[in-house]
């Protein structure tokens, strides 16, 4: 899952760093632990409407904008381009806000306990900073949550479309489908098929609603993208029964993200290695295998199994600070 790892700015005294070999980890300091809060559907709807106030007319307009883009135009889109994002947020934001980041707290719990967080010095300072920029309280707290606690983002549909164009994808397998950006991109480009797999059964209803929206956008004379969604552990799927010429996914950054119903693995040995081996095995000849993974996973897992990448696509992201030199890639292999 795409994750922007926000650099911490200012003298918050929130983190201390420890170094083990090449890997640096940041430890939580000074924040009280709260039990996970599960709001009612009504409360979740209210929060999501504040964060993503969109209606069907706006969603359709966004979809049409994506449809009008050629592959060449898609390639030229900047990191600022948000077209299509509101569609994904409209259907899956409610579930995404349950996700815990590196500080082991989700946004619903953060918002529920805002009286405590208001008293944290650097959060109080940021609330004052945002006072003149956005009057809505929920949005202010979400900005701060993204900045200091966790910024778990969607995979932008426009970026998925760029990858599909780059490898001439027709039949896509996405074994950690996440929030729907890659599905939306496949549908807009009218690819032959999209197979999505996710263990989080809470996403079944949001995806059903998204697919209903997409079906209403289809042109009668066009061939429809065949969509198959499988809600189960990706390790238990029989891939020999699936037909795909492109694997494209963005697995969870297991040391940063914690989703509902997420299984606890030794991620390298029990998830990445067997998943890459089995999905590569049944990938069509001349097909493409595309992974958005951290550099250490690329080096320690992907290279021993797949060899060096044949090409890569940089993840276009906004530059939030002058020192934010972190780059993220989609690594691509062709099966010959």
Q: Which residues fall in each region the model found?
A:
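Class I S-adenosyl-L-methionine-dependent methyltransferase catalytic core
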Residues: 1-83, 93-336
């Amino acid at each position: 899952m795409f994750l922007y790892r926000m650099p911490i700015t200012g003298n918050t005294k929130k983190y201390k760093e420890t170094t083990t070999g090449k890997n640096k980890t940041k430890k939580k300091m000074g924040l009280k632990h709260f039990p996970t809060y599960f709001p009612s559907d009504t409360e979740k709807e209210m929060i999501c409407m504040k964060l993503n106030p969109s209606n069907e007319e706006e969603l359709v307009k966004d979809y049409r904008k994506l449809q009008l883009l050629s592959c060449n135009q898609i390639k030229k889109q900047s990191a600022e381009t948000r077209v299509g994002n509101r569609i994904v947020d409209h259907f899956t934001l409610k579930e995404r806000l349950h996700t815990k980041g590196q500080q082991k707290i989700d946004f619903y719990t953060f918002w529920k306990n805002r009286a405590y967080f208001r008293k944290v010095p650097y959060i109080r300072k940021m609330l004052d900073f945002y006072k003149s920029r956005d009057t809505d309280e929920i949005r202010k707290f979400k900005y701060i949550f993204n900045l200091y606690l966790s910024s778990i983002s969607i995979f932008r549909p426009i970026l998925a479309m760029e990858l599909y164009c780059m490898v001439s994808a027709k039949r896509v397998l996405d074994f950690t489908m996440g929030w729907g950006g890659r599905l939306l991109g496949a549908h807009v480009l009218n690819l032959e098929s999209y197979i999505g797999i996710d263990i989080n059964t809470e996403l079944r209803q949001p995806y059903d609603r998204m697919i209903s929206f997409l079906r209403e956008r289809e042109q009668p004379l066009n061939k429809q993208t065949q969509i198959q969604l499988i809600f189960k552990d990706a390790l238990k799927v029989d891939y020999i029964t699936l037909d795909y010429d492109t694997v494209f996914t963005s697995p969870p950054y297991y040391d940063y993200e914690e989703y509902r119903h997420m299984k606890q693995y030794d991620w390298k040995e029990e998830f990445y290695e067997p998943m890459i081996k089995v999905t590569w095995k049944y990938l069509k000849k001349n097909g493409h295998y595309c992974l958005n993974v951290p550099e250490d996973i690329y080096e320690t897992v992907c290279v021993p199994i797949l060899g060096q990448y044949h090409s890569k696509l940089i993840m276009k992201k906004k530059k939030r600070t002058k020192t934010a030199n972190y780059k993220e890639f989609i690594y691509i292999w062709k099966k010959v």
